[in-house]
Amino acid sequence: TLENLEWRISEVRRLMISQDMDIRICRFRQEQALLSILPFCKLDKKLFEASKRNMLTSSAASCYPFTSFEMSDENGILLGVNQHNNSLVIVDIFNSRVYKNANMVLLGTSGAGKTFTLQLIALRMRRKSTQVFIIAPLKGHEFLRACNNIGGEFISISPASKQCINVCEIRKQDLSANQLIDGVVNENSILAKKIQQLHIFFSLLIPDINHEERQLLDEALIRTYAKKGITHNNESLIDPDHPDRYREMPLLGDVYEILMESPETKRMGNILNRLVNGSAKTFNQHTNVQLDNLYTVLDISELTGELLPVGMFVALDYVWDKAKEDRTKEKAIFIDEAWELIGDDDTSNPNNAKALAGEWVQEIFKIIRGYGGAAVAATQDIGDLDRSRFGKGILNVAKTKIILNLEEDEARRVQSILHLSDAEIMSITRFERGQGLISTNSNHITVSFKASPLEKQLITTDRMELNQILQEKMAQNAHNADL
């Protein structure tokens, strides 16, 4: 009816005005207006002149729910397929001409596929000869199949493991490439730098350590290395009998013996005793693993309670030393469930162990670019990341973010951080496993992550798919037995 038509016109006019848009009725030019909006390329010149306006490209981009429909770097790794145009999404985060840094953050709720996506990226980086380190604080067994298949090194850090990383070891680094580039040799005390790192380790082990004990611990550490002939003179590190390597390094047991000599340091020695003579004495050994492999997984999932942040520190310390060797080589450090190490950001409390560790992790994210590397963190604790100074710092220095499925309240937090549109947030809350949004360089693209059948078999955590793999292997073993 005419009344109904007039009501609809009124509603459309009211809606446009609410959006700060002007609306005019094409009186006596309805036919030209209809032909102009149809895909006939017959835009009426008079209507165009009456309605045209200048617009910034940023304003024009806001008319679209996603600001980019293409992401295909020349030498990148394949992540998946663009959901909007089925083009391949290929990203080279190490291309410094395109990306300010190679850091990446994966966000998603439990079961969204963070571990699957993280391993998929890590495997494809490895196939491009990028050195990959993965630190797994939870469910480390999920990384074992892929690691074994690609010929990687799987290192288990736990009280029950025979493998050990000596936290007191000063590792000899291959700095030949850096010296050729810079033409200078670093004369800073290597021992002083190592002791500084050990202070973080003991702060994690003894959260209530006070200022006096810190000073006494510092003296004990210097004495421990002095007994092995190591001083602040870097030349003292060289083994006289084997000039191509360093001297034998002290163990935690050597530190323990010195701490137990004095009543003022005996309390620290008693706490350290668990790692020397107690159930976790596996930490009191010389390093018996190698990090030369291009794909290294450090599993600390069997560490619980106060040993978990200690184990993460040991793993990060070892990997970080290796990552700084050659600035010309690509390398990536993956930290799954990074919040386990970052913790609180209250640095005003000197006894806050997680604050010290969080500051250290944030520093890695900030400066790893200078060593040709990337730091990748995966977490589902988005609220804590948003509230924490360290969490915000990591988000700010990660140029690339991958957002998997999120609950609506978590998605709204991400929206305020990454300035996503309502359409993008709606997509995030409806993502199925294997789908995500990549945000980088102001581009936002929805992607279906694609894995080959072999990759899926190596990294899947789905119960039904694991059961299918089990049945296939049992059938294969039965067939081999019959032969």
Indicate residue ranges for each PLM-predicted region.
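Charged, low-complexity C-terminal accessory regions
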Residues: 429-460, 467-469
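A short helix-turn-beta junction within AAA+ P-loop NTPase domains corresponding to the substrate/partner-engaging
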Residues: 151-155, 390-403
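Conserved AAA+ ATPase core "coupling" helix
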Residues: 161-169, 408-417
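Conserved H-loop
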Residues: 383-386, 394
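Phosphate-binding active sites in nucleotide-utilizing proteins
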Residues: 105-116, 122-138, 142-156
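H-loop/switch region of ABC-family ATPase nucleotide-binding domains
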Residues: 379
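P-loop NTPase motor domains
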Residues: 32-89, 95, 139, 144, ...
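Accessory regions of macromolecular translocation/handling assemblies
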Residues: 1-50, 87-118, 122-123, 130, ...
